[in-house]
Curated annotation (Swiss-Prot):
Organism per entry: Bordetella parapertussis (strain 12822 / ATCC BAA-587 / NCTC 13253)
EC number: 2.4.1.182
Annotated catalysed reactions: a lipid X + a UDP-2-N,3-O-bis[(3R)-3-hydroxyacyl]-alpha-D-glucosamine = a lipid A disaccharide + UDP + H(+)
EC top class named in words: transferase
Gene name tied to this protein: lpxB
SUPFAM superfamilies linked to this entry: UDP-Glycosyltransferase/glycogen phosphorylase
Stated role: Condensation of UDP-2,3-diacylglucosamine and 2,3-diacylglucosamine-1-phosphate to form lipid A disaccharide, a precursor of lipid A, a phosphorylated glycolipid that anchors the lipopolysaccharide to the outer membrane of the cell.
Protein name (record): Lipid-A-disaccharide synthase
Molecular function per GO: lipid-A-disaccharide synthase activity; phospholipid binding
Keyword field: Glycosyltransferase, Lipid A biosynthesis, Lipid biosynthesis, Lipid metabolism, Transferase
HAMAP family named among the record's database cross-references: LpxB
Length: 393
């Protein structure tokens, strides 16, 4: 009988991860059958999707509230199928609110469970470790420090590296990226990434644009380039940019990035420095070895929600940006909340743009970080999943 694996991925990043894991599983266990919730990358590997990935996609608390009936229906159907015909192992990729609950019920029924991408308990709500311990047979984590954390808590864990480290080149090619984007080879370029969500753009774009205007005043030759994930976000950003004009500002979307490389990656690679919203983009910037200034602002309402959910006013770690968390140091500046003024952002970004010695030091630290994160992620993940399945057989 062929190996059967249940899987749930709820976001494009999870779909990409899962697609590569399925490829790794197929190389080691020909005939393996994977089914559950997934996206196009998983489907391309023969995944049987009971529900499309977007069935789990929500945008903020209001959207989540509106989607409760459909989310519960999807959850109930997936749980019923997996309990009726238990797989050899279940793999939840990220989406912790959905997957940890499902994993707990499956594990209680005797199905071993693997969770890929550890929730950020190291940043807030550490008490979730108890839910993870009850729900998960084996954790697969992306960052080296997470392995020690879960091992200390008695949870079987495997560090599999971060897949981005295997995709982004160890030695970025600034000239090639500029050629793709039509940017002069000798220009000074600032990449501006105010986030991919409407709320992030609304709160960060005005500050970033005012900072950029000051930087262009200091250096009229400076080129500011803003990658946008889709035309809708571009329209939202450009409406704000009309109120905060920056000479020579350029927005680019996927069609202008040329080739399969995400346009944001091309802009990072082409840049001298990056002004970036906290999130995965900070890790991508680090892997491109670029100096950066990290910023984030929450609305007053979201500040209250986050404080209530976490039961704390401050995070467990002094760092917010992933590069700083991984390096355990303020390697790059973080300007958050009330500190994220246009003047402060401009000053920190000017330093990132003009300090050549500092840029060389950052490049060396980010190169070492890249090497630490570089593993054969699909192979390591597939091997761990198969070992969990074999152990339960």
């Amino acid at each position: 009988m062929s190996l059967r694996i249940g899987m749930v991925a709820g976001e494009p990043s999870g779909d990409l991860l899962a697609g590569r894991i399925i490829a790794g599983l197929q190389a080691r266990a020909p005939g393996v059958h994977c089914a559950g919730i997934g996206g196009p990358q998983m489907a391309a590997r023969g995944f049987e999707a009971w529900h499309p990935m977007h069935a789990l996609t929500v945008f903020g608390y209001i959207d989540a509230f509106k989607r409760i009936p459909s989310l519960l229906s999807t959850y109930g159907d997936v749980k019923r199928r997996l309990l009726a015909e238990p797989p050899s192992v279940f793999v939840g990729i990220d989406a912790p609110d959905f997957n940890l609950r499902l994993e707990h019920q499956l594990r209680q029924a005797g199905t071993p469970t693997v969770h890929f991408v550890g929730p950020s308990i190291w940043a807030w709500r550490y008490e979730r470790i108890n839910k993870i311990r009850a729900a998960v047979s084996h954790m697969l984590v992306l960052f080296p420090f997470e392995e020690a954390l879960y091992r200390k808590e008695g949870i079987p864990v495997t560090y599999v590296g971060h897949p981005l480290a295997g995709v982004i080149p160890m030695q970025p090619d600034r000239a090639a990226a500029r050629a793709r984007l039509g940017i002069d080879a000798d220009a000074r370029v600032l990449a501006i990434l105010p986030g991919s969500r409407s709320s992030e753009i609304r709160l960060l774009a005005p500050r970033f644009l005012q900072a950029a205007a000051e930087l262009v005043r200091r250096d009229p030759r400076l080129q500011c380039v803003v990658p946008m994930v889709n035309p809708q976000r571009r329209a939202e950003f450009e409406a704000i940019a009309a109120q905060h004009p920056v000479p020579g500002l350029r927005c680019v979307t996927a069609a202008e990035g040329q080739g399969e490389t995400p346009v944001a990656w091309s802009v990072m690679e082409a840049s001298n420095a990056v002004l970036v919203a906290s999130g995965t983009a900070t890790l991508e910037t680090a892997l491109y070895k670029r100096p950066m200034v990290i910023s984030y602002v929450l609305s007053p309402w979201m500040r209250r929600i986050m404080a209530w959910k976490s039961g704390q006013q401050r995070p467990y770690l002094p760092w917010v940006g992933l590069p700083n968390v991984l390096l355990r140091d303020f390697a790059v500046p973080e300007l958050l909340q009330d500190e994220a003024t246009p003047a402060a952002l401009a000053e920190a970004t000017w330093q990132a743009l003009t300090d050549e010695a500092g840029a060389a030091r950052i490049e060396a630290r980010f190169t070492a970080l890249h090497q630490d994160l570089l593993r054969d992620t699909p192979a390591l993940a597939a091997q761990a999943i198969l070992e969990v399945a074999d152990g339960a057989a």
